[in-house]
UniProtKB/Swiss-Prot annotation:
Matches recorded under SUPFAM superfamilies: F-box domain
Keywords: Coiled coil
Species, as recorded: Arabidopsis thaliana (Mouse-ear cress)
The UniProt record lists the keyword Coiled coil: yes
Highest taxon listed in the record's lineage: Eukaryota
PANTHER family given in the database record: F-BOX FAMILY PROTEIN, OS07G0183000 PROTEIN-RELATED
F-box domain boundaries: 412-458
Protein name as annotated: Probable F-box protein At5g25300
Pfam families: Beta-prop_KIB1-4 (PF03478)
Coiled-coil regions listed in the entry: 346-377
Length: 477
């Protein structure tokens, strides 16, 4: 991968960047127990929500700073800068105080990286987990990663195995015994035009599963299989296969009768129940022009709630978000309508909301119908301070039919000391609103390379907070 000049924002013209990234941010919290949504008082413009654990959110701002915020208060926890990675293992101060909020952040830049970085509360730098050097051949490389339970990290390897790490307060981390390694299930057949991937899943009882996905290019057909470690393996069979696996279920071949006869191409939103082995479809969500969707699982004691948040572009001005409770038989949806030009939203469930919607649509239409000359002048008014709030589109974007008359001179100062390829990996992934607006502005091809992946698990101090276990979130930028 070529390294770009870190002092430059992007090869895209200024007006395209402005169109993509001028949208102010916001965050709405939806509580399914109360069937109400709340808008936080915190200003969330210029930041991206990456992950969350109940009310604590991991965010990234335009200067590539990472920190954790409490969306219900002004509490903020600063994380070390991305360039603060230090080699080697270090001791950790005891952090078992119940009054402290304990967290761990784990990330990597690209699947070809040589390390995974992690940080716990109380540390001022990231420590690295080597995945190439000083690691046995069977545990090298990285394919997928899952942080579960606050102290267990599962890493799927390209050599058909899963590496499990356990975090400790003083030792940092250790590799678990090889007996807990879950090998990939080798593909016994291959069909032309088919692609497959192996991913990790962990159940609520902490049982590790292997999810094998198949996608057929010619028919656009998908199927998957679930495997787990064989609890009662045949001793004779373990001679050639020391880690035998058993198939839990499959979907897309024999078990998919009634789902594979669809003649029209549309998106399916489904939930598969491991206990009943049944697939539950949500037809109301299948015909949406989705730009993004996020599934969440929340718990309250032994009760688990599965929910989904989807987004649909209504037109060039509005985006509609729908929240659906997957456990509810009625599949009742809560709708929120967001302005893509203003940081405003309307509760679609209110009886008197239609009047408010019409008023907002009229107002935004008037602003949207400004002349091209006025729009060009507004774009030319960008200053260095505005540049500081923008995020690089990055990636290998292909832009056509660009209006050069709207370009603005590059007034941005060097915005980071990180190498260009790392910056591109961090910021190449656009939020769903921005990417939809990009497609309306000009044809853009998204890069296939990997972006920054982060996980946040809070494993102490939050279980005593009432009425927060079922809170889901909606975010947009």
């Amino acid at each position: 991968m070529d390294t770009t000049n870190s002092s430059r924002w992007s090869e895209l013209p200024i007006d395209i960047l402005r169109s993509l990234l001028e949208q102010k941010g916001g965050c709405a919290i939806y509580n399914p127990d109360e069937a109400k949504d709340y808008k936080t008082k915190r200003d969330s413009s210029g930041i991206r929500f990456l992950a969350n654990s109940v009310n604590w959110f991991l965010v990234l701002d335009s200067r590539s700073n990472l920190y954790i915020i409490d969306v219900f208060s002004e509490k903020k926890i600063d994380l070390p800068p991305l360039e603060s990675i230090k080699n080697g293992l270090y001791s950790l101060e005891q952090v078992g105080d119940e009054k402290k909020k304990e967290y761990i952040v784990v990330w990597f830049f690209d699947k070809g990286t040589e390390y995974i970085a992690f940080c716990k509360n109380g540390e001022d730098h990231y420590r690295d987990i080597p995945i190439r050097k000083n690691v046995c051949k069977e545990l090298q490389d990285l394919y997928d990663m899952l942080l579960h339970g606050g102290n267990n990290l599962y890493i799927s390897k390209t050599r058909q195995s899963i590496r499990k790490l356990r975090f400790f307060e003083e030792e940092g981390f250790i590799d678990v015994d090889n007996s807990e390694i879950l090998p990939f299930r080798k593909i016994s057949f291959y069909i032309d035009g088919a692609r497959f991937s192996n991913n990790i899943a962990v159940t609520t009882s902490r049982e590790v599963l292997l999810v094998q996905n198949f996608f057929y290019e010619t028919t656009r057909y998908r199927s998957f299989r679930l495997y787990k470690k064989d609890p009662n393996p045949d001793l004779n069979a373990t001679i050639n296969n020391p880690y035998p696996m058993v198939e839990l279920c499959s979907l897309g071949d024999v078990s998919a009768s009634g789902f594979g006869d669809r003649k029209r191409s549309c998106l399916d939103m489904c939930m598969f129940n491991l206990v009943t082995k049944k697939l539950k479809r949500f037809p109301d969500l299948s015909n949406l022009k989705l730009t993004d969707a996020r599934c969440t699982t929340t718990s309250s004691g032994n009760n688990w709630k599965f929910s989904i948040i989807v987004s649909e572009v209504i037109d060039s001005k509005f985006l509609e978000l729908r929240f659906a409770d997957l456990d509810s038989e009625s599949q009742q949806q809560t709708k929120l309508k967001f302005s893509m030009l203003k940081s405003e939203f309307v509760d679609m469930n209110k009886e008197d909301s239609q009047i408010e919607i019409n008023e907002k649509e009229t107002k935004i239409n008037q602003e949207h119908d400004q002349s091209d000359e006025t729009q060009a002048k507004r774009r030319r008014s960008l200053t260095s301070s505005v540049w500081q709030d923008l995020v690089s589109v990055g990636g290998e974007a292909n832009v056509k039919e660009i209006d050069r008359s709207m370009e603005t001179p590059n007034s941005s100062p060097p915005w980071s000391e990180l190498p260009g390829d790392i910056l591109r990996s961090v910021f190449e992934r656009l939020s769903f609103v921005d990417f939809q607006r990009a497609k309306q502005t000009c044809p853009i091809k998204r890069s296939k390379s990997n972006c920054l992946r982060l996980w946040l698990i809070t494993f102490g101090g939050l279980e005593r907070l009432p009425h927060l276990s079922s809170v889901c979130f909606i975010s947009w930028t």
